[in-house]
């Protein structure tokens, strides 16, 4: 049976189909040429020398093309212009060394022209083991046995054929005017065209027909030169690999800070110094006379003021101090920091903003106390009154001055004074270390309790903060396991056993905390591409540094150099594709940016830019458009565009307009509509989704293309990443440990990978090449193409189909691993929605963030239009960059995958700041919940929170007011934790009056997925609430008075304080005879000397005298009028007005009770400074307490408080036995409960009613080592 010869699938000779079929695309002739150094080989029967030449690859041309990119071009002053008008130096001196070497090579080749023909035998290299006629590779040119290896024979043949003359950059033309004609193979110069043809024939080539045309060689040279120094082909140095961790971390927050000083935020300050009369100086009771240090100030008046960390010894200043001046000075600035722009130049503050400013002050109070109490060691006290107690050793040279303050019972004196009496009543053994040894198992104990001066509020705040960090604490074994999981096992992390347990490593974080922080990041991106682009660029740089894949464009040029073309062709497919893939005017980082985009397909959609599509839709008859289609078809599967499949289909449909017609169901989106316009699911043609609607007769190519897309488009997959059990997961719409991929993922080869042609992207490329071959073979679509051009195009596609690029295998095996390794450590964790391939119903159409719960919206301002944020950023990529990377990837020759990744990944996981992103997520979550809690105090958000400060005036904050308040909260949080970049900025725009954060994404079929992260408990918000509850009872300590004030003349010699007035001077709305001046009241002045009358709130006309009640707002709006009309009545005492304040800052003016004092000047000045937007601090005139008898003078008071507001008074005449005249106050034993009450438990506190000033403080001896000191990584 006669075997049917197989039709050639390789290169055509340029004159139609070859009559002689070959199975190896000219490889037999190549071996023959290399073995036979005697010149042109013997042709087979029926094949001319010209036809045989056309089937041979140009080995010399290939080598010259690859070598020429490495040497500079030597141009003569004169030359022949090429097709583009560029002049090349093609003239060589007759007596040059190049000519001599070329002639020598030519003569060497001519010696063997008479050698006999090589034998012919059969081989089984054909398809289906078909024996085809081919030259034997085991015989030499004489017919004898040849035992040399093929590689040796090829090298010898090449050295004989190719000149040793250094190659030039670019191939000069073969013809020249002037001095001669130069051979582009060996650089020999001939003197006529006939001599040149004969010379070229000695190379086995012909002057007009070459296997690699000069046009291709020129484009190869330009292609290689353009790529030579491009950043995408540069391999990162080891030094640069050590900097990879810098791309992973933002600012490291100051989460753990230590304070070795006193744990107190309330300071006892002397207000009025002690006054000693001369006649009793000899009988002084002052302990200072005996050089005894007192635990309390020795003064006539001492008060408690807020001063955070006034006795601290910290390692880092959070710069959030709240320092309140003594009440004898003006503290109004503390209550006008927020929302008081119009009052900055006056000495007043807006009373409607008091609550917001108080909340901000309380937040600063909490933030400045987020310290851990440092364990500093103990030493036994040798003084007699402590019974050998172990007292804490303080660092610093001035430690001694603090002991009397820390331990009041160390003092002992027989003097009689309020201080001494207090010390004598204390429980002596409640001092120093309590109930725990200092050393445990030979090391300092992990924590210890100590009795010392401290305030209960600060102790509680620091205790809660320590408990929060303790919940985040993880042991080295957990870190070892978690890092190994995150590194996918490529880095061996070990945790050496150590007996010490005094480690504090707060790195554990919950999923909910990471999800809330993730939503904040997503809101920050919104629709702004400038925010996400740097993120993707950093990840692309990181991928380039850790990836073994190297982009080597010479793989493309070497492949194209083997394409057979005719120099007489007007079009060159190989040259055209090389020109398309040059890096000019393109961002060739797009390949790895596309990979980075896989991590964020929920917030950014990577699309192919419009410039990559065929111009004006293109035409199938255009070679340029065909290559645009090829480049586009290869690049589209790597994007995250869910409409990429239909864009690929419509790109070819655009080019087939006029040749093939498909049914389009939309009058606007027709077949001629640009493919890039099909960017939403509703534009998908029905014929694409149901390919049976495409006629295989009327549109065979488009039907084939649709079938290819449906069958061979890459399938999505997933890979495991992270350690959510320890580090949490920010995934919102996917399981915690899942990373989605748009292509199939296969396990990576842990040793040395080999070339694989079975992966999805290689199959996809092969199908695209086959489709294009069908296009060029059909004369219907290419009526103007010659058979030579068709053959050349088919050959080019075959080369591209089988190009030896490692990129497709890398994308399927190693790229997912790289993404999974870096994803857990990124500052912006992956945000993904499921990839849908060709399922239009599941295409995501909307991703949005909601700030407000629909069930709790009570104001029109809280509409969804202002609280929703729609997310979505399109990011255009260059298809040429992606295609170049797909076609030119290679691995290092000695690559061992697991060893490579161990070296590349280790610097990331050995960095000391590897956990900074986790800690930032925790702080972000704390800040969000704190903001929600605080905003709910000044606006009606229906958020369930205790409102302890409702008695402080406040307006109902609008969105703008709440945004200003939120901005201050954000600034305070960033300052306290030493952060410089984004924290709560996304919430500052729009309406920050939020109650919850939720995120939704909607599919095209209408299905919606909602994720509402559960708000975990916020320690900072809880501490602010605790401080607010304490403030509700101890407001005087913070410089605020509660209740109203009464303005009226009261003259008396009784030395009472207006902060605690006699009850008979106070009246309210329920007091008989009291009139109320309401908003609608009117004053009617009397005629002919009659007293003025006022229509009160009940509508009755009454004389303007007696007791009246005015709302503060009414007085502010009519301050000028009231000041002019009422001052005379007030000064005479005929009129007393109660102004309803609610809360107000105050200022004390002490006077000598032995001298006459009148407070009218203070009162009138205060009334004059009231404006519609502000009130100053209310002035009170207070007598100085005296420890001896005095002769009291009358005092005239004009402003008194309606409630007791003297809780900040600590003691009067503390160094004396008693107070004789004026306000009297002993040292408050209720604030020293555990020191004065032996029945009180040692750990008892009286918050929120009373702030204890002596407590048990827990101090810690934890270490906070860097990660490198806890675990060891073995690369």
Swiss-Prot record:
Residues 118-149 have a biased composition (Polar residues). It is an enzyme of class 3 (hydrolase). Residues 1-12 have a biased composition (Basic residues). Keywords: ATP-binding, Capsid protein, Helicase, Hydrolase, Inner capsid protein, Metal-binding, mRNA capping, mRNA processing, Nucleotide-binding, T=2 icosahedral capsid protein, Virion, Zinc, Zinc-finger. Its EC number is 3.6.4.13. It holds the Pfam family Lamba1_VP3. It catalyses: ATP + H2O = ADP + phosphate + H(+). Homodecamer; each decamer is made up of two conformers of VP2, called VP2A and VP2B. 12 homodecamers assemble to form an icosahedral capsid. Interacts with protein mu-NS; in viral inclusions. Belongs to the turreted BTV-fold inner capsid family. This is Inner capsid protein lambda-1. The lineage of its organism: Viruses, Riboviria, Orthornavirae, Duplornaviricota, Resentoviricetes.
């Amino acid at each position: 049976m006669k075997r049917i010869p197989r039709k050639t699938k390789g290169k055509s000779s340029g004159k139609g189909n070859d009559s002689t079929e070959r199975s190896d695309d000219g490889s037999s002739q190549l071996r023959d040429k290399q073995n036979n150094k005697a010149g042109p080989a013997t042709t087979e029967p029926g094949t001319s020398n010209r036809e045989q030449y056309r089937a041979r690859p140009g080995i010399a041309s290939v080598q010259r093309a690859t070598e020429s990119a490495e040497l500079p071009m030597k141009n003569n002053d004169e030359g022949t212009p090429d097709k583009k008008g560029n002049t090349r130096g093609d003239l060589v001196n007759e007596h040059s060394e190049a000519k001599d070497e070329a002639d020598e090579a030519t003569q060497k080749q001519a010696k063997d022209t008479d050698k006999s023909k090589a034998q012919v035998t059969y081989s089984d290299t054909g398809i289906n083991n078909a024996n085809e006629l081919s030259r034997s590779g085991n015989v030499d040119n004489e017919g004898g046995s040849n035992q040399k290896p093929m590689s040796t024979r090829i090298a010898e043949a090449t050295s004989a054929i190719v000149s040793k003359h250094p190659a030039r950059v670019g191939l000069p033309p073969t013809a020249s005017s002037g001095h001669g004609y130069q051979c582009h193979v060996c650089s020999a110069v001939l003197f006529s065209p006939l001599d040149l043809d004969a010379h070229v024939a000695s190379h086995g080539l012909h002057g007009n027909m070459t296997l690699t045309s000069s046009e291709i060689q020129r484009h190869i040279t330009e292609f290689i030169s353009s790529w030579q120094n491009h950043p995408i082909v540069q391999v990162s140095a080891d030094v640069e690999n050590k900097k990879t961790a810098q791309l992973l971390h933002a600012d490291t927050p100051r989460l753990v800070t230590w304070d070795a000083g006193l744990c107190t935020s309330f300071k006892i300050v002397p207000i009025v110094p002690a006054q000693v009369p001369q006649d009793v100086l000899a009988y002084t009771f002052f302990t200072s006379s005996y050089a005894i240090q007192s635990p309390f100030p020795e003064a006539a008046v001492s008060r408690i003021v807020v001063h955070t960390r006034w006795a601290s010894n910290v390692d880092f200043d959070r710069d959030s101090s709240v320092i309140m001046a003594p009440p004898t000075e003006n503290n109004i600035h503390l209550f006008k920091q927020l929302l008081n722009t119009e009052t900055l130049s006056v000495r007043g503050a807006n009373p409607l903003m008091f609550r917001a400013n108080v909340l901000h002050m309380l937040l600063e109070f909490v933030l400045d106390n987020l310290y851990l109490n440092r364990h500093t060691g103990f030493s036994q006290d040798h003084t007699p009154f402590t019974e050998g107690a172990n007292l804490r050793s303080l660092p610093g040279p001035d430690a001694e001055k603090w002991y009397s303050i820390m331990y009041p019972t160390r003092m002992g004196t027989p003097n009689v004074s309020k201080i001494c009496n207090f010390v004598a009543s204390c429980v002596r053994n409640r001092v120093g270390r309590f109930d725990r040894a200092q050393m445990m198992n030979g090391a300092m104990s992990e924590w210890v309790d100590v009795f010392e001066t401290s305030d209960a509020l600060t102790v509680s705040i620091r205790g809660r903060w320590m408990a929060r960090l303790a919940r985040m604490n993880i042991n080295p074994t957990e870190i070892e396991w978690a890092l190994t999981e995150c590194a996918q096992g490529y880095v061996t992390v070990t945790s050496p056993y150590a007996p010490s347990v005094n480690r504090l490593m707060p790195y554990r974080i919950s999923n909910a905390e990471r999800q809330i922080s993730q939503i904040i990041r997503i809101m920050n991106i919104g629709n702004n591409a400038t925010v996400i682009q740097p993120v993707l660029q950093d990840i692309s740089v990181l991928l380039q540094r850790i990836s073994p894949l190297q982009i080597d464009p010479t793989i493309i040029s070497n492949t194209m150099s083997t394409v057979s073309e005719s120099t007489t062709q007007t079009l060159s497919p190989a040259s055209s594709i090389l020109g398309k893939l040059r890096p000019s005017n393109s961002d060739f980082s797009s390949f790895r940016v596309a990979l980075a985009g896989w991590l964020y397909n929920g917030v950014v959609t990577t699309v192919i830019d419009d410039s990559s599509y065929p111009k004006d839709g293109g035409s199938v008859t255009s070679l340029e458009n065909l290559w645009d289609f090829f480049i586009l078809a290869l690049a589209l599967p790597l994007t995250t565009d869910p409409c990429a499949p239909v864009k690929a289909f419509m790109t070819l449909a655009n080019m087939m307009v006029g040749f093939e017609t498909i049914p389009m169901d939309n009058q606007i989106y027709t077949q001629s509509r640009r493919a890039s316009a099909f960017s939403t699911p509703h534009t998908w043609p029905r014929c694409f989704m149901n390919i049976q609607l495409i006629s295989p007769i009327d549109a065979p190519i488009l039907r084939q293309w649709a079938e290819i897309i449906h069958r061979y488009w890459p399938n999505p997959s997933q890979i495991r990443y992270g350690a959510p059990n320890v580090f949490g997961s920010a995934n919102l719409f996917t399981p915690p440990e899942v990373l989605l991929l748009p292509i199939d993922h296969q396990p990576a080869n842990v040793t040395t990978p080999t070339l694989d042609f079975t992966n999805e992207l290689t199959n996809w490329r092969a199908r695209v090449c086959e489709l294009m071959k069908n296009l060029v073979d059909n004369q219907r679509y290419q009526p103007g193409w010659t058979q030579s051009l068709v053959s050349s195009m088919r050959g080019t596609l075959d080369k591209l189909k089988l190009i030896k690029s490692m990129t497709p295998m890398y994308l399927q095996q190693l790229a997912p691993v790289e993404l999974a390794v870096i994803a857990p450590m990124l500052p912006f964790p992956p945000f993904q929605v499921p990839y849908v391939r060709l399922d239009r119903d599941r295409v995501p159409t909307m991703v949005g963030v909601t700030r407000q719960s629909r069930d709790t919206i009570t104001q029109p301002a809280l509409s969804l239009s202002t609280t929703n944020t729609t997310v979505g950023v399109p990011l255009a990529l260059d298809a040429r960059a992606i295609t170049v990377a797909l076609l030119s990837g290679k691995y290092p020759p000695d690559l061992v995958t697991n060893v490579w990744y161990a070296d590349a990944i280790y610097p990331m996981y050995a960095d000391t700041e590897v956990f900074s992103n986790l800690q930032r997520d925790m702080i972000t979550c704390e800040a969000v919940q704190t903001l929600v809690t605080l905003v709910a105090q000044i606006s009606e958000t229906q958020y369930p929170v205790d409102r302890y400060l409702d008695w402080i005036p406040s307006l109902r904050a609008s969105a703008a007011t709440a945004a200003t308040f939120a901005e201050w909260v954000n600034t305070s949080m960033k300052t306290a934790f030493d952060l410089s970049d984004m924290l709560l900025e996304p919430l500052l725009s729009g309406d920050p009056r939020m109650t919850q954060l939720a995120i939704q994404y909607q599919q095209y079929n209408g299905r919606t997925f909602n994720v509402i992260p559960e708000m975990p408990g916020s320690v900072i918000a809880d501490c602010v609430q605790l401080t607010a509850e304490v403030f509700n009872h101890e407001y005087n300590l913070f410089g605020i008075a509660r209740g109203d004030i009464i303005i009226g003349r009261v003259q008396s010699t009784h030395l009472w304080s207006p902060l605690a007035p006699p009850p008979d001077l106070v009246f309210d709305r329920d007091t008989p005879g009291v009139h109320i001046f309401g908003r609608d009241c009117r004053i009617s002045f009397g005629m002919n000397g009659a007293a003025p009358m006022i229509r009160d709130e009940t509508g009755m006309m009454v004389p303007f005298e007696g007791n009246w009640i005015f709302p503060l707002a009414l007085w502010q709006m009519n301050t000028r009028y009231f000041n002019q009309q009422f001052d005379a009545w007030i000064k005479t005492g005929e009129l007393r007005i109660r102004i309803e304040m609610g809360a107000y800052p105050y200022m004390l003016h002490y006077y000598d009770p032995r001298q006459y004092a009148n407070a009218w000047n203070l009162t009138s000045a205060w009334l004059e400074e009231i404006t519609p937007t502000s009130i100053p601090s209310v002035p009170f005139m207070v007598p100085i307490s005296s420890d001896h008898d005095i002769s009291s003078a009358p005092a005239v008071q004009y402003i008194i408080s309606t409630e007791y507001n003297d809780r900040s008074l600590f003691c009067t005449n503390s160094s004396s036995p008693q107070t004789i005249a004026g306000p009297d106050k002993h040292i408050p034993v209720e604030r020293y409960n555990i020191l004065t009450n032996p029945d009180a438990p040692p750990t008892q506190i009286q918050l929120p009613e009373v702030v204890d000033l002596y407590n048990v403080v827990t101090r810690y001896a934890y270490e906070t080592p860097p990660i490198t000191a806890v675990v060891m990584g073995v690369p």
